[in-house]
C-alpha cells in the first residue's frame, strides 16, 4: 500500500516502504523547503516523472559512499594533477541543475522536472543545496549538486560535457566534506558507475541510524567556498 500524504501530513515510517518497487514509501505532498528537509532528515528522497504526483522513496539497501572509501583511478588522478579544470563552488547552481536535467543518452528527459529545479533552487537560496562546478576555458564543463544537512551530504546528480569534468568536481567535493567532518554521501540508487568510485550498499536500517546521528550534528548553513586540495593529498 502506498501512503498518500497531504501538505500538512508527516511521512510514514520508512519501514513501511514497498519491496516492489523497492523503496516506494508515499505519494503526494509538495516540494517546499520544509518538506524536502524533513524528508532528507528521515532518509527519504523525491523521485518521479513529469505528470506524476511527487513520489517519495527509501530503498533497502541504500547506496552510499563513505568519503574515506572514495576511489580515484590513475587517469582521474592525472587529470586532477594537471589542473585540467578550474573548480568553483556555489557559483553557478542554476546552470548545474539545468545541465543535469538536460536530456542525455538519447532519452527525452530526466526525473529533474521544472518543479524539482525550482524546489532545489529554493534550497540553495536557503543555504542547504550546493553545487560544485568544473570549468574549462571559461565554460562550464561539468559539475554536481546535492543537499547538506548537519554532517550529512545527499548527492543528487552530476553531468559532464568533457571527460572527467564531473569526476574532478567530485574529487573536490570529497575534499570539502573531509574538511567539514562530513563522512557520508547518500547516493540513493545503485549504479555500476558509483560502485567503481567506491560506493556500496548498506541496509536501510544502518543508513537511517547514520542519518539520524549526522543530521543532528551542528554545521554552518550557507554558501560554501573551496580551497583546492594539494595534488599530493588527492586520494
PLM regions and their residue ranges:
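N-acyltransferase acceptor-side catalytic subdomain
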Residues: 1-235
Amino acid at each position: 500500500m502506498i501512503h498518500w500524504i497531504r501538505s500538512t501530513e508527516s511521512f510514514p515510517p520508512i519501514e513501511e516502504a514497498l519491496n516492489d518497487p523497492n523503496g516506494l514509501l508515499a505519494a503526494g505532498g509538495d516540494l517546499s523547503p520544509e518538506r524536502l528537509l524533513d524528508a532528507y532528515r528521515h532518509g527519504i528522497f523525491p523521485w518521479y516523472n513529469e505528470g506524476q504526483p511527487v513520489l517519495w522513496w527509501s530503498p533497502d539497501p541504500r547506496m552510499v559512499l563513505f568519503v574515506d572509501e572514495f576511489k580515484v583511478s590513475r587517469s582521474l588522478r592525472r587529470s586532477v594533477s594537471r589542473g585540467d579544470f578550474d573548480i568553483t563552488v556555489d557559483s553557478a547552481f542554476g546552470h548545474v541543475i539545468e545541465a543535469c536535467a538536460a536530456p542525455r543518452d538519447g532519452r527525452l528527459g530526466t526525473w529533474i522536472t521544472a518543479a524539482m529545479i525550482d524546489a532545489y533552487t529554493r534550497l540553495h537560496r536557503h543555504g542547504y543545496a550546493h553545487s560544485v562546478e568544473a570549468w574549462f576555458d571559461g565554460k562550464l564543463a561539468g559539475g554536481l549538486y546535492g543537499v547538506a544537512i548537519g554532517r550529512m551530504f545527499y548527492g543528487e546528480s552530476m553531468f559532464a560535457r568533457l571527460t572527467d569534468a564531473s569526476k574532478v568536481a567530485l574529487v573536490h567535493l570529497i575534499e570539502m566534506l573531509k574538511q567539514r567532518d562530513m563522512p557520508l554521501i547518500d547516493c540513493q540508487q545503485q549504479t555500476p558507475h558509483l560502485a567503481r568510485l567506491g560506493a556500496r550498499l548498506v541496509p536501510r536500517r544502518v543508513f537511517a541510524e547514520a542519518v539520524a546521528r549526522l543530521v543532528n550534528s551542528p554545521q554552518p548553513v550557507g554558501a560554501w567556498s573551496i580551497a583546492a586540495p594539494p595534488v599530493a593529498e588527492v586520494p
